[in-house]
Structure formats: C-alpha cells, structure tokens
Amino acid sequence: MALTNFSLPFGALGQPWGVTIAPLHPIHQLASNTNNLLYSPADHQQQTPAEAAADPEYFKNNPYAPPQSGGYQYQNTAGRRKQSNAYLPPTAPNAVRNSVYHIQQVQQTQQQQTQQQHQQQDQHENSVSFQSSSSRSSSSSTTGQSSIQLTQTHASGRGPAEGSYSRYPGQQAQPPQQQQPQQKQYFNAHGSASATFTKNSGSFSITSFGSRQQQQQPPQPQQPPPSQQQQPPPAPPPQRSRQAKPEAQPAQTYGVAPPENYPERAPGFTRVQAGQGSRTQVHAVLDYDVEEGEEDEEEDGEEEGQFYEGQENDKSNNNQMPTVTPIQGPIYLKNGTVPVVPLFSYPKLNNGSFLQIPIWWTALSVALGLDVRGDVIKGVPCIKRYHQLFCPTAGNSYPIDKIERFIDDNKALMRRMYGDFEMNMEGPGGGGGRQQGKVRKRRFIDEPDIFIPPGAFAANAGETVEAGDSYFGQLRKKRQAAAGGSRNRGGSAGGSGNGNTNANRQPGNKNGSSGTGRLDACESKIEIVTPYWASNSAGKIRAIVNTQHFEQAIHQEVCSNTQTPRCEGECGCEQKYKWHRLLAYDPDNDCKGIFMDWFLFPSCCVCRCNP
C-alpha cells in the first residue's frame, strides 16, 4: 500500500509546544527519509474501516489515516520519566510483539489512567527541556501503553549492535524505589544521524538483530489486543544530558560514541524484506568482539610492549565495549559474503649463512673424517692447510663444463701443453739407455722437464731414476716394497675425486733408505693428491685442471711429528715446500682459458737443529 505523508504531524505542532518549525528543519528531513523505510510484509497489515474511524486523539501520528484538517495536539507530558534506553519490550507469552508496527489497543480506561499518571509526574519534575523532536513516553506499571511508543528494556538485554541513533538517550532521573514499578516503559527514540531505526524485540534496522526477551521485571500478564494500525514514531529528540551510569548507555552504530557497557547476549538476525515502493540499503559492518579473558592478555601485552604496527596504547580508555582492531592486509570474502580480515602477523626467524656454515662444515668433517685444522675459504669447499688449499671435493663452483669445452676446442694446444713427448735420460752408467717413444707424460714434482735449470736434477738423477724409466715406476717400486704386494703400473695416479695415496716413511724403515744407506730422521707421510683448487704464487685461487682425460697429481711429504727419537732436543722436524707448475683455469675470466701457473705444495719433512 502507498504510504501517506509521514511528516504531517511535524508540520502542525500545537501551541503548547510554543515552537514554530521551519519546513527545512532536520525533523522534516528525518521524516522524509523515514518514508523510505521498509516494512515487513508479515508485520504490515491493512487497517479496517472501524479502526480508521477511531479517535484521532489516539492515532496521533498515523500515516495511514486520512489527512486531517488540523494537526493533532500533543499532550504536554513534561513530567514523564527520563529513561536510560530506548528499546522495545519483550513479547509476552499471551500477546503479540509490541513494536512500532504492532501497537496495542488501549481502552478508554487505560487512557484515563495514563493522563492521571502524567499529572502525577508533572509534580515531580523540576524543568522540561525542548521536546519538539523528542519521543513520547507514557507508561503504566500495571497496564500497557496508550500511545505509539517503543519499549524500554534493560541494558543487559541489548544485542552487540543494537542501539538508538541518539547520542544521549533519555536517562532515568527517579530514585531506585520509583524505578522498580516503572521498569516496563514504552519509549520511542530515534537518532538524528541516520534515517533508519534500530530495534529491540523485532524492530526494523539496517543492521538488524533478532528480538530477545530479556527484562529485569517480568512483563505484565494483562496485555490488550494488538492494534492493526501502524504508526511511525515521532521525530528524534534533541541532545539530552548524559547520566554517568555505564550500564545505562545503549550500543552505538553509525558515527556515535561507543557505550560503556557490553551486553552478554549472543546476536540474532532478522531478515528484512522490502515492501512496495520502498528502497533497501545494506551496509557491511565489521564488528570484532572481545571475549572474556582477552582483556587480561592485552594488558600483559601492553606491559611487554607487544603491539601491532599502527596500534596505539591507550590505557586511559577504560571502555567496556570491544575496540575495533585496525585492518591489516587485504579483505578476503569467504563464500563471497563473509569478510575475512587477517589481523595477526607471526614473526619469522631466518637463519643466516653465518649459523649454517660452521654446522655444515662440522658435520662434513665428522662424516668424512677430515683433518680440519685450517682456515675455511669462502666460495670453495676447501680449507687452508700447509700454506695451500686442501679440497676433498671439487664442489659446485668448479668450472668443469668450461674446462672441457676449452679442451675440445683446443686439442692441439692441450697436447703441446700437457703432452706427448719422448724422454731420453742418461744415467751415470752411460750408454744411451732404452727409449720410450710417444708416451703421454704427466707433470709432477720430481719429473724433469725443459724448465728445470741445468744441473738441478742431473746431479742425483742416476741415484733415483734409471734411464728411460718414469717417476711413477720408481714410486711404484717403493710402495710395493713397503706393502709387500704388487700393483698395476700408474695405479697411484688414479682418477678418483680425492686422489690421495698415502705412504708412511719411518726412521729405520727400508723405504726410507737411499742408495747411500742413510735413513730419514723425521717421520713423514707421503701423499699423492689430485688438487681441484689451489692458491697460486700471487695468492689468487685458481681451478686446477683435473678431468677424466687430463689429470694432474702432486707428490708431497707431510711431517707426522715435530720430534722423533733421532730428531729431538735442540733439533726438530720442519715441513718444506716446493713450487709446482700446473695447468689452471681462472673461474673469474673465461677469456684466459687454460694456462700454466705456479703453486706451492708441501714437498718433504726435514730435521733441523739450532746452530
């Protein structure tokens, strides 16, 4: 049905008010805005002709009644009680809901009692503020309501989002002994900040919660039959004085200060259906409730200094209402309707390499049984020992692909550098020994080549190397003599990853003797290693060429002890070093390719004495 002019009562206020309201007054704007409110089809009922002809004095602000010639005169109920809340009463078991849409039929006798009650209240009131836009409250301790009013309930019966749109609703100014019989009041309060109504007991609201029947005083069993006339409430009241009772403040919704009391009731929901010729506006509201026990945790967090970013520590706010946590991060709609807001961010602990490297090296040394008495070198899996790098493996940074590509592109150069050549050595016995032609030779520490100065190796060549024999042949004979078995020729060079072959030389042992019959005074350990990384004469780390087809090995002797029974007292065993020329590759400069470079490795162990 079509709605009549809702602002009719507001334009014809009677003389008892003594106020002339302009057409553009906020009261009229509120009345025009409330014309677009929705009325539930289940709650809305047509008026009957008998009810339409009822006393106009009773149907004061009836928008469905025919227009009257003059405005209705409001009763000057200046002595009405100031109530703390403006909500609807709970529904009695034998009556229908008492809301703005279901008003109660009041008999003539009840109207007379109401008028008498107003006259008694006028004697107890001291002053009356401006009430042109305020709501009418008429109540009886034993009967229902005589005018179109909302019902007041106690603050404990409010929902989480219920509340009037008035910042300072009416407060009770009477003593407690007078509040008990007047607990059930029918009060109507509407906010001036919005064009919608909040509700309790089934009233309409944009953010609506279901009715809940909670009241300190039980409802009166005598309830008159409901009226089918639907009358909207009067205009909102102006600002009233705020009473310092925290439990008397209603919950707030849009742009109104939060109250000081939070109810302990679960929210309900009421479905709002639009009527004919009306509009619907739905606003999403994020409400975060503080549960019991969380306030103590927040206080502990304040002492420890644990706060979210952007959240201020306000201890002066002792508000009982839950504070809305600031939104952190994007809003995700679950199932397209429910907003999910991430409110917590958990700190993460990132372990840096400074913690992982020592643990990794310790585990590696224990697993491989390595002697890690040295400095760890950054970038390569090596440690520095005996003034040189000791690398058990090549590691991931070894440029094996670049080395093999260079070898494939420069095979002739590699043969000349690495080479196939004939070695013809003459011993002291003279006489042109056997020649071994076209044998690929590997460069080692004691192998003579064209770079050895004249006389550096020929002086003792006849004592250690026979004509036409290689260094590994002599080394193989020494190992066979020490181990008492036979091995294949060249087996000591190998091609394994570590490439280490150890042999101990002890004083008095046969393998420590020379052609002169003298023995080594210091114990030493012979190692044949195939290095992957080494430090050159300039202190730069270079990759040593050791691939499947091109292998380079180093023969070295490492001192086992600092003193021996034959080297003690003022004497001691010292480690000696020697320079080696090896094929190397610069991992930082691919343009250099493979080149020859000098590297220092341990050579032997000698016993030295003080002068």
From Swiss-Prot:
**Gene Ontology CC annotations of this record:** extracellular region; extracellular space
Polar residues biased stretches: 191-210
Glycan attachment residues as annotated in the record: N5, N335, N351, N511
Q: Where is the composition biased (Low complexity)?
A: 104-120, 127-153, 169-185
Keywords in alphabetical order: Disulfide bond, Glycoprotein, Signal
Name all Spaetzle domain ranges. 521-609
Question: Transmembrane region positions?
Answer: none
Which residue stretches does the UniProt record annotate as biased composition, category Acidic residues?
Answer: 288-306
Record bears the keyword Flavoprotein: no
Residue ranges, compositional bias (Pro residues): 218-239
Q: Name one GO molecular function term.
A: growth factor activity
Q: Which InterPro entries match?
A: Cystine-knot_cytokine, Spaetzle, Spz/Toll_ligand-like
| One GO process term, biological-process aspect | central nervous system formation
Known Pfam families for this protein? Spaetzle
Region annotated Disordered sits at 57-322, 477-518
Q: Where is the composition biased (Gly residues)?
A: 487-498
Task: State the source organism's domain of life.
Answer: Eukaryota
Observed phenotype of the null mutant: RNAi-mediated knockdown has no effect on neuromuscular junction (NMJ) growth. However, conditional knockdown in the muscles results in a decrease in bouton number at the NMJs.
Cleavable signal peptide:
1-14
Q: Which cysteines are joined by disulfide bonds?
A: C522-C573, C559-C605, C567-C607
PANTHER family for the chain: NEUROTROPHIN 1-RELATED, PROTEIN SPAETZLE 3
Purpose: Neurotrophin which may function as a ligand to the Toll-related receptor Tollo. Involved in a Tollo and JNK signaling pathway that positively regulates neuromuscular junction (NMJ) growth in presynaptic motorneurons. May function by activating Tollo to promote the phosphorylation of JNK.
Q: How does it assemble?
A: Homodimer; disulfide-linked.
Q: Give additional notes from the record.
A: 'Spaetzle' means 'noodles' in German.
Query: What is this protein's record name?
Result: Protein spaetzle 3
Q: Which organism is it from?
A: Drosophila melanogaster (Fruit fly)
What's the gene?
A: spz3
